[in-house]
C-alpha cells in the first residue's frame, strides 16, 4: 500500500508517428491521473514561446519609404509583401544576424528561391511566394535583415531602440518577428489502463514546424528546458540570509570600568581595593552600611564615593543580575 502512494508511474514512449518531415505525432503512457494535462500544457507553452529561430526583422525596398506605399509593376502592396516575407523559413549556421538580397526584373512570380544568400544560410520553403511582377519593365530590389530570437517580438517592443537611432532607420520597413519554428502544437489526454488501474492518462502530442527544426528535436529541447527550470526545486534549500540580531550589552559599559577611573582620593581607593572592589560594577552593588564596615573608610570617604557615582547617574545598593560578566577577570 505504501509503494502505491509514494511511487509514481514513469511513462514510456509508446509511439512516434512521422506524418511528414515537419509533422509528428507522439504518444506517451501511462501517466498518473492529471499528469497528462500538467505535462502537455507545460510542453505546449514552451514549444510555442521558447524555441529559438530566425526571422525577418527589417526590409529595405528600393523606392519605398513606408509600408503604406505601392510599387509600380508589382501586384501586391508593400504590407502584403512584408507579410509574405514573414513566412520565410530560414536556417542560419554560426551567426545571429545576416543580410539577404533580392533583385528581380520582368514578368513573373518572385519566390524565396530568388533570394541571394551565402553558404551559411538555408531557406527551407524555396517556393514561398513573395510578390508578383506584372510587366516587362517591372523590377524589385530589396535588402532583408534576418535575426535570431525567441518567441514573437512585435515592432512596438523595439520602439525604444528605434527612437534612439532614428537616422539609422530611415527607409527601413520594420517587421513583427515570429522567431518560433513551431507552427502548431496540440495535445490531447486520453484514458489509459495498467493492469487493474483504469484512471490513468495517455498524452498524445501532435506538432508541426516550419522545417527549420526537426519536430522530435523540438520536443527534446522543450523537455530539457522544463527539466532545467525545475531542477532548482529538487535541491531546494533556504537561501535567505539569517537575521542578525544586534547584541545589546548586558551591562552599561561604565560598570565594566575599574574603580580607578572614578579618580577617588588615595585613601578611598585603597580601602576599596582592600575589599577586592576592582570594578565600578562591584562598587555600586555595595550598600552604605557595607562600605562603612570597611576598615579606614569613614563617612567622608562614603560621601565622596556617593557624589562621584551620582555624577555618573549611578548609586550604591544597585542590583546587577548575572554579575560579574564572563569577560571580566578578577584581579
From Swiss-Prot:
Stored InterPro entries: DNA-dir_RNA_pol_insert, DNA-dir_RNA_pol_RpoA/D/Rpb3, DNA-dir_RpoA, RBP11-like, RNAP_asu_C, RNApol_insert_sf
The keyword Transcription belongs to this UniProt entry's keyword annotation: yes
Gene Ontology MF, one: DNA binding
Region (Alpha N-terminal domain (alpha-NTD)): 1-237
EC number: 2.7.7.6
Keywords: DNA-directed RNA polymerase, Nucleotidyltransferase, Transcription, Transferase
SUPFAM superfamilies (alphabetical): C-terminal domain of RNA polymerase alpha subunit, Insert subdomain of RNA polymerase alpha subunit, RBP11-like subunits of RNA polymerase
Cellular component GO terms held in the UniProt record: cytoplasm; DNA-directed RNA polymerase complex
Keyword Endoplasmic reticulum included in the entry's annotation: no
GO biological process: DNA-templated transcription
Signal peptide region: none
Start and end residues of each stretch annotated as Alpha C-terminal domain (alpha-CTD): 251-331
Catalysis: reaction(s): RNA(n) + a ribonucleoside 5'-triphosphate = RNA(n+1) + diphosphate
Family annotation (HAMAP family): RNApol_bact_RpoA
UniProt similarity note: Belongs to the RNA polymerase alpha chain family.
Quaternary structure and interacting proteins, as annotated: Homodimer. The RNAP catalytic core consists of 2 alpha, 1 beta, 1 beta' and 1 omega subunit. When a sigma factor is associated with the core the holoenzyme is formed, which can initiate transcription.
Comment, domains: The N-terminal domain is essential for RNAP assembly and basal transcription, whereas the C-terminal domain is involved in interaction with transcriptional regulators and with upstream promoter elements.
The protein's role, per its UniProt record: DNA-dependent RNA polymerase catalyzes the transcription of DNA into RNA using the four ribonucleoside triphosphates as substrates.
Name of the protein in question: DNA-directed RNA polymerase subunit alpha
Lineage, uppermost ranks: Bacteria, Pseudomonadati, Pseudomonadota, Gammaproteobacteria, Enterobacterales
